[in-house]
Amino acid sequence: MSTPKSDTCSPHQALARGMGFKNHHERLWWATFGPLLEKLLALCNYPVSLQYQHLSFIYHHLLPYLGPYPTVENGFAWKTAYSPDGTPAEVSLNFDGPKKTVRMDHVPISQWSGTPKDPFCQNVALELTKSLAGTLPDFTWDWFNHFVQTMFIPEPATDVVLAREPPNFRRMAMQSVNGCDLLTAGVRVKPVFNALWKSIETGIPHDKLLFDSIRNNTELFGAYLPALQVIEDYCQSDRAKEFQTRGCFLSFDATSIKDARLKVYLHGPQTAYMKVEDAFTLGGRLSNPNIQTGVKELRKLWYAVLNLPSDFPESEDLPATDDLYQGWLVNYELRPNNPVPEPKVYIPVAINNKDQDSIVQGLQEFFDRHESMDVRDYRDIFETLFLDAKNPTGIHHFITFSYKAHPYVTCYYKPHLEPVPAKELEESDVKGLSK
């Protein structure tokens, strides 16, 4: 009697076979992000049961909110500035000492985004958040509802705001971004807000709207205001104004824990290292031992992953790119009753998107200096994720750095997408196409 042949499949394939897809858009998004997330989770030694748990979460709660898949004829239905080519999602790998964590971030999008049914992409963000809140036991609405009230556009103002819309503005003005940390204990959700549309409505500068939305609610944010004041003082300084450094986003942990983080993001279009370092230290306002060590390590990492010669002037900007969000970002973690913001720099390695080898080499040199991070072969990690038959299938978008007694580095990845003919997205028996 012959033994039946086993038909084994990977976790992301098993989920697809068991549940199918609502439409071809979801099928194609899963073909891109399903195997990528599975590889990341396996590389980070997540138990198989936890891999299924997190893949199932992405499948049910994020996949339906990635929007229409790009077509050959029309590209993206809602093209954001979230990545250089408009892809609305990315994955990331965080190295916190020897601990490694997988993450996924995306702009919530639907077929109605940009239409009269959802002109600012707000309704889909609310729908997504309701879905997440119904699943995550520690989700809290307090901060989210506050920022919806202060940042979202009320329906009566829609026509006025659209009439004032500048060219290319929709790509820049992402009303909401959703971040998810895939942790051992579950999923941590981090909504992101900006005030660009609200600035169009009110005529108030968007960075002022961001700071005011926090400062004006002492009931929710009183414990965070001393740290916020340090950031505001820097933004009002002559140096920050000279470098055109301004507030651009805010984010937070949507959890009920008492030490939930509030994050404020600054953006600078001028990419000379000295300007980034100035923001990292908030013009010298931050000078504790972590900052002093962090500055030294930041410079090494910046020069390594951007493949800059050691004598490249710190006062010279990097080459311009066609990325609408070109420049750098720094976010500052604010914790309750802690007057010291904790900075994290986003290094814009996407300017070297044709030179992934230098980025990989620069990261490995950094990891080799910090053996406690336990990254012996970063090239193998990157090639496992993004090398198919010797052809790269993704790029590094950002590398982030902070220092908290040890280096804290995150690699953000954008997979390549292949647009399909529109006819391939026509409705049919989609569930039968779930392999």
Curated annotation (Swiss-Prot):
Belongs to the tryptophan dimethylallyltransferase family. Induction: The onset of expression occurs at 60-hour-old stationary cultures and the steady-state levels correlates with the onset of aflatrem biosynthesis at 108 hours. Expression is regulated by nsdC. L-tryptophan binds at A81, Y82, E90. Indole diterpene prenyltransferase; part of the ATM2 gene cluster that mediates the biosynthesis of aflatrem, a tremorgenic mycotoxin with acute neurotoxic effects. Synthesis of geranylgeranyl diphosphate (GGPP) by AtmG (a GGPP synthase) precedes condensation of GGPP with indole 3-glycerol phosphate, followed by epoxidation and cyclization by AtmM (a FAD-dependent monooxygenase) and AtmC (a prenyltransferase) to produce paspaline. AtmB is also essential for paspaline production, but its exact role has not been identified yet. It holds the Pfam family Trp_DMAT. One of its GO terms (biological process) is alkaloid metabolic process. InterPro entries: Aro_prenylTrfase_DMATS, DMATS-type_fun. This is Indole diterpene prenyltransferase atmD. One of its GO terms (molecular function) is transferase activity, transferring alkyl or aryl (other than methyl) groups. Keywords: Transferase. Substrate binds at R103, K190, R261, K263, Y265, Y346, Y413. It is an enzyme of class 2 (transferase). Its EC number is 2.5.1.-. It comes from Aspergillus flavus.
